């Protein structure tokens, strides 16, 4: 899906298995390119979380190669530090990611572990707090924050590392509609900065709005890796992976069928795009 010179992270022919378990990954190959917006889809146990842990170097494959910017990643500490500095993971449950007694201390933890100069640590922390609108929370204990606020802190943790790739595991889980909207605004901003965003989600409506590319996992294998529109048009893959079509996608298809609309025009992904799509369809 990406050009060779745009590839940041490459997983080539990788297999992984957990002890005494059939779950894992079977001979998968994926390239993550600069600035991509990717949705990782599939049922529970499909291999999405294992894929994320391999991408971040937390797990090691028993077969295949994992590369970052064209270089193989070994078990050396220097390799792993460089990898985790550039490939960050925002876990589903922020409670499991936050360890410090204040928001400021939490966000500074990563840069300090990189052994950066104090001035550079402060610069990164200030920038991350500002990006996530957390300046007013800097001295507050994270355990007293709401779920949405904790999610923002966990994202600020990763931003302070200044990564090139961020992996989000079920980022909309347990968030109310207002915080989902704030999260999507944040993702738009990060994407505008050229950061590669990879999101594992069960929310197909969110995936369709957010991503330009979809990777579908099932039984530890990749069923499909293509443009997000093509993912949701592949009925066989959706059935095998237990996925459904996004509501706005199904509605748009129905409108097109009923009005005889132009099949070459892209289907809308947002309410605003749907308004324009309806206007064009009504004219026909």
Model-found features: residue ranges?
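The feature captures the beta-strand-to-loop junction immediately N-terminal to the Walker
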Residues: 41-43
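Helix-to-loop junction immediately C-terminal to a conserved catalytic motif
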Residues: 56
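Conserved ABC transporter NBD signature motif
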Residues: 64-75, 83
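Conserved ABC ATPase "signature" region
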Residues: 119-137
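Conserved ABC ATPase signature
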Residues: 141-145, 149
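Catalytic Walker B motif of ABC-type/P-loop ATPase nucleotide-binding domains
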Residues: 166-169
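H-loop/switch region of ABC-family ATPase nucleotide-binding domains
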Residues: 201-202
């Amino acid at each position: 899906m990406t050009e060779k010179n745009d590839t940041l992270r490459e997983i080539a022919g990788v297999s992984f298995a957990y002890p005494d378990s059939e779950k894992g990954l079977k001979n998968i190959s994926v390239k993550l390119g600069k600035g991509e917006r990717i949705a990782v889809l599939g049922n529970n146990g499909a291999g999405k979380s294992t894929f994320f842990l391999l991408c971040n170097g937390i797990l090691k494959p028993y077969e295949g190669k994992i590369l970052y910017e064209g270089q193989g990643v070994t078990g050396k500490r220097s390799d792993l530090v460089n990898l985790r500095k550039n490939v960050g993971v925002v876990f589903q449950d922020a409670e499991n990611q936050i360890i410090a007694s204040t928001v400021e201390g939490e966000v500074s933890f990563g840069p300090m572990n990189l052994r950066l100069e104090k001035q550079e640590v402060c610069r990164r922390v200030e920038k991350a707090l500002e990006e996530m609108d957390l300046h007013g929370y800097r001295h507050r204990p994270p355990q007293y924050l709401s779920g949405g606020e904790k999610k923002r802190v966990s994202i600020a943790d990763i931003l302070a590392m200044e990564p090139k790739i961020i992996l989000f595991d079920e980022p909309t889980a347990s968030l109310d509609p207002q915080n989902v909207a704030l999260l999507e605004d944040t993702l738009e901003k990060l994407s505008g900065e050229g950061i590669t965003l990879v999101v594992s989600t069960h929310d197909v409506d969110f995936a369709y709005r957010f991503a330009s590319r979809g990777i579908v996992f099932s039984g530890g294998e990749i069923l499909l890796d293509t443009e997000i529109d093509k993912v949701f048009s592949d009925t066989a893959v959706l059935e095998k992976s237990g996925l459904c079509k996004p509501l706005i996608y199904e509605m748009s298809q129905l409108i097109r069928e009923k009005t005889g609309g132009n099949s070459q025009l892209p289907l809308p992904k947002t309410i605003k795009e749907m308004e324009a799509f309806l206007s064009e369809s009504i004219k026909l």
